[in-house]
Structures are given as structure tokens and as C-alpha cells.
């Protein structure tokens, strides 16, 4: 059976991921006019720039949908976001600033929950608005087929008939008006934005050029912290975790994770926390550039890793970072539910996150400028009395340290012999002054 359909399957049910924007509105209306039977599915992901979710399915029905459903994905989205924090599933960082994989997390939830809803309605053909150059076309493909093995894919933006008739936003707008819908294009921005309640992605258009900075972006989850005219007073915030799960902000306990994330967004957003500018590698290994917002994720991540470093030993922390980066890449590629990802998630949540209990107090200032004011946990292995510089009882003595250093002579001797072995083969040069072979200065060799 052909998985990807290049032309409209006339007379068949097609589920379309319907946002209510111009692209999906025109596509839905066009498919109905050409003889398909479109079903519209809208994901409520808590998008900060969406004002009225209930109106979206109504518009879909007006444009010819056989049926239209609004699927509440917020609870599942926040659950996956917390899991990503517990696992450190983030692989794109620049200068210490992290992209929290908020779009890949949203696609994992949307791609599974919408296709599951379609399956309930007997709809086995799925269309969405992703383009062939991006990551989402592969993410949705993978998640869709994982959820429904019988699924076929039809994307209007891969159909030459659709492209020939409605190849641009102007043509789509004219098409809607000609069909009796007073649909006016929204004001064109200098970039494109995609968002969910975990974060926002700004990319494309002017942001494709690296001489266009964050300063052209109008944040939808935070503030323009780079604008000195924007007043941002410092603020203290306390975050509490229990067994790896964020449960309280500023002493207020949340039984609803969605409400907790919304409050974390509000707190971090007041300062512009979590904004970053990243050059990343798409799934097809071409580089792209995005500017990201994730105020709540950033706040929780900072507090989580502060507790992590005070609770776990060095080797565990090293494995957390290594496996977290690996898991983040799998998430980015649309493999969040693949077996290799589940294996990494299980080990990180079971052996790392389960011990993360405690409170962290921070002072937030402008952007990603903050200070950690206090860290409290019953599980801390940080014990200041062990290494105090003050006189008093100690867990080990000077003689103990002499013995420990003496044992180091074994590997120091081995290392010295290797250095001289490298010098004999020409990999290192001998040093008359230090007595230790050294890497040659390439400048002296004219290289």
C-alpha cells in the first residue's frame, strides 16, 4: 500500500490538522470542492497566541469539514515536557543557553493524539501543513504511523495540483474571498512563529539572515529584556521538586501540572528568561536558525539541575548529560517513543529524577541573568563540613591525603613514560627546560 499520496484521494475521508490559519483553511475548502471528505482536528496545546480555541472547529465546519474536533493535548504536553526536564533531553545549546525542544515535544503529542482521534472516526488519511524542507514532515510521518499502521499521508503542499492553483498566501486569500469567505491575510511579520504552552519558535524570513537578531522579535511569552526602556524589577522565586516532579512555586502547591506550567511561564516570562538564539542541524542535516522562548521550562530546568548537582555524584551527572543529549537528539528527530529513547528515559527518570527532592530559590533579573540564592534538600550529598577550611573535626586526615597522593604515583609514572614514547615517535618535541615532551609550536614550523 502506498503510504504517501501525491494527489487528492477523491471521495475518501481525509483528516487535516486544522489550525484555523489561512493555509489550512484554504486547503480544507479546496479539498472539499475537489471531492474529498475532510475531517478537521485541532490540537489545544495551550498556544499563548491563540485567543479562542472553540471558534476554530466552527470555522472548519463553515469551510466544508464533515466534522471538526478540538482535542485537548495540554495535560499530555506538560507531562512530556516534565519528562524532558527530568532527563535533560536537550542537545542544542549555544554559549550555555539551551533550546528546550518545545516544538519537537509538541509534535510528539500532536502527532499521536490527533491520529488517535482520527482513527476513532474511521479516518485513515492524514494531512498537515508541514513543508518538505522542514523537520515536521518527518516527525508527523513517524508519529502518525506509530499510532495507526494503516495510515496514509496526503499533504496538499506536496500536491502539484494544489500548488498550481493556490501556490502562495495571496492566491489562498483570493480563493477564500471568491468562495464567499471574507478572509483577509494577517499582517505579515518579519518571521514565522509556532508555539505551544511549553515554548515558542520564531524562524524563517528575516531570521534566516544572521545579521537579523533577537531584537526584531516580539516575544509572545516574555518581554523585550534587551530594551532598556522596559522596566523589569528583580524577583525572588522558589521552586520545589518531589522525586523529580515540580510541585510548588513560591510555596503554592499545584495538583494540576498544566496550571503549574502556566504559572512558571508567567514568572519566567516577566523577565524574558529562557530566550535563546540557536543555529541547529535539521533532520536532513542542513543548518537552520531559530529564536526560542521557553520561560517556564527554563525556570524548572535551572532549579532541577541545581538540585541534581547537589544530590548525585560526578559519574551519574556525567551520564545524565551524555544520555540527555542523546535523548534530546532522538526527540528532535521524531523518535521520542522509539525503543532507544524509552530505554534512556526510563534509566534517567528511575535512577536520577527519583532522588531530586528539594527547593531552590533564585533571583531573576533581565533575560537569562539570575542568581541562585538557596538550595535545600534532604538528599543533598553536598556537606560543607567535609571540606571546611576551618579548624575542627575532619572526615580524613593529612596522612590520609598523603597516602592517596602516593597512590597517584602509579598512573603519573605511566603517563610520563607515554609522553617520552610520543617524543621518540615525533608526535611530541623534547623540552630542554621542563624535561617534559611538549606539542610543537606550529608557528615555529611555518604552518
UniProtKB/Swiss-Prot annotation:
EC number: 6.3.4.5
Entry superkingdom: Bacteria
Binding positions for L-citrulline per the UniProt entry: 99, 135, 139, 192, 201, 203, 280
Annotated Gene Ontology cellular component terms: cytoplasm
UniProt enzyme class: ligase
Protein name: Argininosuccinate synthase
CDD domains: ASS
Family that this chain belongs to: Belongs to the argininosuccinate synthase family. Type 2 subfamily.
Binding site for ATP: 17-25, 43, 129, 131, 136, 194
Residues at which L-aspartate binds: 131, 135-136
Organism: Shigella sonnei (strain Ss046)
InterPro entries: Arg_succ_synth_type2_subfam, Arginosuc_syn_C, Arginosuc_syn_N, Arginosuc_synth, Arginosuc_synth_CS, Arginosuc_synth_type_1_subfam, AS_cat/multimer_dom_body, AS_multimer_C_tail
Statement: the UniProt record of this protein carries the keyword Transcription: no
Catalysed reaction equations from the record: L-citrulline + L-aspartate + ATP = 2-(N(omega)-L-arginino)succinate + AMP + diphosphate + H(+)
